[in-house]
Design a protein with these regions (language model features):
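Extracellular beta-strand ligand-recognition surfaces/modules
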Residues: 20-21, 62, 133, 215, ...
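Aromatic/acidic polysaccharide-binding cleft in carbohydrate-active enzymes
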Residues: 43-44, 658-730, 734-755, 761
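Extra-cytoplasmic beta-strand recognition segments
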Residues: 58-67, 101-120, 232-234, 298-299, ...
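Extracellular glycan-recognition regions
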Residues: 72-304
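Short carbohydrate-recognition loop motifs
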Residues: 77-94, 319-338
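C-terminal beta-sandwich/jelly-roll accessory domains of carbohydrate-active enzymes
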Residues: 208, 770-841
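Extended acidic/polar, glycine-enriched regions
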Residues: 338-340, 345-444, 448
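Noncatalytic carbohydrate-binding groove/subsite architecture in carbohydrate-active enzymes
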Residues: 408-412, 416-418, 575-681, 690, ...
Length: 841
């Protein structure tokens, strides 16, 4: 291979077990930006809320939750809910059934108003899918349903599926296979249909997979006026009579079918898929209209007696009180009987010597008690808050655990005969409060990793985020209205907490503003102004309107946030609209603070033209890559080739100083393959001037999350473990030097990156051997002597070795040395290994 100024390679296997390189160590061949070693700190799977931020209470304001229908595949969707106007709202992703009623007759009418739009919402096209609305109204004798279906395929061909989580990829593949089998119109239609099991085409002579698909029993085309995006209410009526069903849309018959099986019981269920539907005036009557069989609110979306994150106990009564609350809309009422009655939440980790500190708002009559107890109702610690006042009042508590340890639950109890409303509960550990509000073990794990920048608050989270939700007093912050990534974010971790966290871990903040592309044009200027106000809140002096708000929140000095990204993964928006946003937002933001750096999203087919037209409006281009498991070795090679193309485009564009920010990267796995990929990826980036910033994802994840299992830091309510990608990244950063060195020679299957120690005393060689064979590496250099070597490496022996709570060091760091012969250094690089060799001159 020719002389390299910036060297890293994964080359096809040459069958050789030996390779030799010659390093030029007299002077650097280039400068590496340590901002490569950043992380995406997205509010996902409790990374911030109840993760980094040591709030131990979920749903602290006792608001009812939406009904998710099914266990989330990736935790990213909202659920069914009924609003104050008695309008039923559907989820907007995945099939989620909502049961309405069941009937012991085949003769009935179902009527309702329907408002449906078939276009994809923001962040909803990641996994593909069929765009339809269905109502299961009858059953076959075997119990399987008959559906009334309204289907509009217009947007199904406009799905874009980047490499995201494994479940998203699986869902996209399944949707594509089902679409190929499903018999359906190429245009919008109404149909009466049932499920059939069919087999997809196999590959390589293998049988295909069997899957349930919708088969139309009768169908009719739907006009644009009947199926539209204008949010118009339509009247739906389904008339069921024995073996026949007739469907009416806006009082006109649209489709009918005679030939339905007649079951003893029929289940009425709402379904939607990848669209948004709302319903009102839902009513089921007998065929002659004389009897009302169902009317009103489905049971699953009715307001519960107890907020969903809390568990009731005792012999009393409970109800959520609307319109009388400290925070948001609801408070929890507890009426005790003859025993202490209350609500609890767990699990909570009880640590010897720890003190549990918090507060609760209450009103009513009776005595209130808080505490921590085990599953057998044995108290670890408790505190009486005394008799509550008639009006809302804040009660603080501090409960030492003493020598107790174990797993418990937090308890709020009302003593016998009491009648108390509670709201806005919070609890932390004293240790966490002493550290600024952060969970101690997660904070330490982040510090040990040394992320050089933190991209926040997302990610896809940005699309729905409003930064003003997360500033001001904690007790005034409202939680999100919608479920996202398994959580209703409490907004306890906002801008001020994020900046404090960055300073605590010595990391540069990267703020991501939203252009909210799914919003109508008449909101554009306000959306832009919101982004500008956020910049002013962070960087303007206290004499500015928004700087004054920051000062009022306890932070008089500007934060001087340098890096600002214009939203996230904008391929759904399209290049024309997004390019306008980059120009408008970037120009306006630079007028407020000319020192900031603007980051624009790439990943468009038109990136080259985007750079040529608008390169002067931004400083960095943001790209994402999630590699599938099989690409742990080859992925970095392909990425290097891609980054080289961008380097050429930047060079030929109006702003040759643009650099790449690989703002999301990882392998979709949590075993040793992630370590090999991380080492190869970082070597690829260190070798190229064009890559200046990086942010791995996921950063922090709770272990019971249903998907995206590739996080660096993995935690539960009491402990954590780090994954191989964390371990390799930490090792690489601990040996970081900004001085890149060139070398010559064939590297074969090895990934090699060479740098000079910043004090000039040695040479650093970062190595990844992704093969199952050892490779002998011979290193020659222009140094006069070798005084010693150190080799730190991971070589667990198998791709599938993974750390866990039970075995945190399944992938363990090893130490070794190379063989020295004069000025020549020889190292045997173990199979499936990643390590750093230091050659001391």
């Amino acid at each position: 291979m020719a002389s390299l100024a910036a060297v890293v390679a994964f080359l096809p296997a040459n069958g050789q077990g030996r390779t030799e390189i010659n390093i030029s160590s007299k002077a650097p061949s280039g400068i590496i930006d340590e901002m490569l070693y950043g992380q995406l700190f997205e509010h996902i799977y409790f990374s911030a809320n109840n993760g980094v931020w040591n709030e131990m209470i979920f749903e602290r304001s006792f608001e009812p939750e939406q009904y998710p229908g099914i266990h989330p595949r990736d935790g990213y969707f909202d659920g069914w809910f009924m609003d104050d106007d008695m309008v039923l709202h559907s989820p907007t992703r995945y099939e989620q059934p909502l049961k309405i009623d069941s009937l012991e007759t085949c003769d009935f009418d179902v009527t309702m108003d329907v408002n449906w739009r078939s276009y994809k919402l923001a962040r909803r096209s990641w996994s593909g899918g069929l765009l339809d609305i269905r109502f299961a109204f009858r059953n076959k004798q075997d119990g399987s349903p008959y559906y009334v279906r309204i289907h509009d395929p217009y947007y199904e061909g406009r799905t874009f599926t980047p490499a995201q989580t494994q479940s998203q990829i699986d869902a996209a593949n399944e949707a594509a296979a089902r679409a190929a089998l499903q018999q359906q119109s190429a245009t919008a239609d109404f149909s009466i249909c049932a499920m059939e099991v069919r087999e997809s085409a196999g590959m390589g002579g293998r049988p295909g997979r069997r899957m349930s698909t919708l088969a139309a029993l009768a169908s009719a085309p739907a006009s644009k006026q009947q199926v539209n995006e204008d949010q118009v209410w339509h009247k739906l009526r389904i008339a069921s009579r024995g073996s026949k069903a007739t469907v009416y849309w806006d009082d006109r018959e649209v489709v009918s079918y005679d030939g339905l099986e007649q079951a003893d019981r029929n289940y009425l269920t709402f379904w939607v898929n990848y669209t948004e539907a709302t319903y009102r005036n839902i009513k089921v009557t007998s065929a002659d209209g004389s009897k009302v069989l169902f009317q009103g609110t489905p049971g699953d979306v009715q307001i519960p007696d107890v907020a969903q994150q809390w568990n009731p106990f005792g012999d009393g009564k409970f109800n959520l009180v609307k319109g009388d609350a400290i925070n948001m809309e609801y408070s929890q009422r507890i009426v005790a009987g003859k025993q202490m009655t209350g609500v609890s939440q767990g699990p909570q980790s009880i640590v010897p010597g720890e003190t549990y500190v918090g507060s609760i708002y209450a009103k009513g009559k009776g005595t209130l008690v808080v505490g921590l107890r085990d599953e057998n109702d044995v108290w670890f610690t408790q505190q009486s808050l005394g008799k509550v006042s008639k009006e809302w009042k804040k009660y603080e508590f501090s409960m030492p655990a003493g020598s107790n340890s174990g797993t418990g639950e937090f308890v709020i109890g009302v003593m016998p005969k009491g009648d108390v409303q509670i709201d806005q509960v919070t609890m932390s550990t004293q240790t966490g409060l002493d550290l600024g509000g952060f969970r101690p073990d997660i904070l330490q794990a982040v510090k040990d990793l040394h992320p050089t920048c933190l991209r926040w608050p997302g990610g896809g989270y940005v699309a729905q985020y409003n930064w003003q939700w997360g500033i001001g007093p904690q007790e005034n912050r409202r939680r999100w209205d919608h479920w996202m990534w398994m959580d209703y974010d409490q907004n306890c971790f906002g801008t001020d907490e994020f900046i404090k966290f960055c300073r605590e871990v010595n990391s540069e903040p990267v703020m991501v503003v939203s252009v909210k592309f799914e919003r109508p044009e008449d909101e554009y200027e306000q959306i832009k102004q919101d982004a500008l106000n956020w910049l002013r809140y962070c960087n303007a002096p206290a004499t500015d309107e928004w700087g004054a708000k920051r000062a009022a929140n306890g932070h008089p000095e500007p934060y001087n946030v340098k890096y600002w990204e214009i939203d996230n993964e904008m391929w759904e928006m399209g290049i024309d609209r997004y390019e306008r946003c980059v120009r408008d937002f970037g120009t306006a933001m630079r007028e407020i603070d000319p020192s900031i750096k603007i980051i624009a999203c790439g990943g468009f087919p038109e990136d080259e033209q985007f750079i040529k037209r608008s390169g002067n409006y931004f400083d960095y281009m943001s790209l994402h890559h999630y590699e599938q498991q099989g690409g742990y070795a080859t992925g970095p090679v392909r990425l290097g080739q891609q980054y080289d193309r961008y380097a050429q485009w930047f060079k030929e564009g109006p702003n040759p100083n643009i650099k790449l920010f690989i703002s999301e990267w990882n392998l979709n796995s949590i075993d040793w393959k992630t370590g090999l990929f991380a080492g190869g990826f970082l070597n690829t980036c260190e070798a190229r001037d064009v890559v200046a910033m990086g942010a791995a994802a996921l950063f922090i994840r709770r272990t019971d999350s249903p998907d995206w299992n590739n996080a660096f830091i993995n935690f539960d309510y009491k402990d954590l473990f780090v994954a191989p990608n964390y371990q390799v990244t930490e090792l690489w950063y601990n040996h970081f030097s900004k001085y890149r060195l060139a070398f010559e020679g064939e590297t074969g299957d090895l990934s090699v990156s060479t740098t000079m120690e910043e004090n000039g005393s040695g040479v650093i060689v970062k190595l990844v051997n992704p093969t199952e064979n050892p490779i002998e590496l011979v290193i020659n250099g222009d140094w006069e002597k070798v005084s010693g070597t150190d080799y730190e490496y991971f070589a667990p022996g198998s791709l599938t070795v993974a750390n866990s709570m039970e075995n945190k060091n399944a992938v363990a760091l090893k130490h070794g040395r190379a063989r020295v012969n004069g000025t020549q250094v020889t190292l045997t690089v173990d199979p499936l290994s990643a390590g750093v060799l230091t050659i001391r001159k």
